[in-house]
Amino acid sequence: MAKSLRSKWKRKMRAEKRKKNAPKEASRLKSILKLDGDVLMKDVQEIATVVVPKPKHCQEKMQCEVKDEKDDMKMETDIKRNKKTLLDQHGQYPIWMNQRQRKRLKAKREKRKGKSKAKAVKVAKGLAW
């Protein structure tokens, strides 16, 4: 069964609401933990992941140099993609494209291929007017 536009929109809006209310939810959970003294923080760390903000500037020069070396080690893998068909060099569609759209494009591509083959057969047989 296909997903309706309404359900997609609702899901998107719920995700936005979660982002907006995340700080309030975190503070509420922390206050609950403060009330119950026998709960260990190790147990909480297994359940929820705590994100620590990263410093904007490197504090030591050694850390900056190490980061630069890691950036150089990255492999550049540019995926060559046909702009018209959206297929890459291996014949795969992009991840973000849904299955119905892939199926539709594949059928369209095969339809064009079939027409050109039929035309070639007619020309070969001498039936072209």
Swiss-Prot record:
Pfam family membership, one: LLPH
Q: Where is this cross-link: Glycyl lysine isopeptide (Lys-Gly) (interchain with G-Cter in SUMO2)?
A: 67, 74
- Gene Ontology annotations of biological process type: dendrite extension; positive regulation of dendritic spine development
Keyword match Repeat: no
Q: Which family does it belong to?
A: Belongs to the learning-associated protein family.
Q: What is annotated about its quaternary structure and interactions?
A: Interacts with CTCF, MYO1C and with the transcriptional machinery, including RNA polymerase II and TBP.
Q: Kindly provide the name given to this protein in its UniProt entry.
A: Protein LLP homolog
Which organism is this entry from?
Homo sapiens (Human)
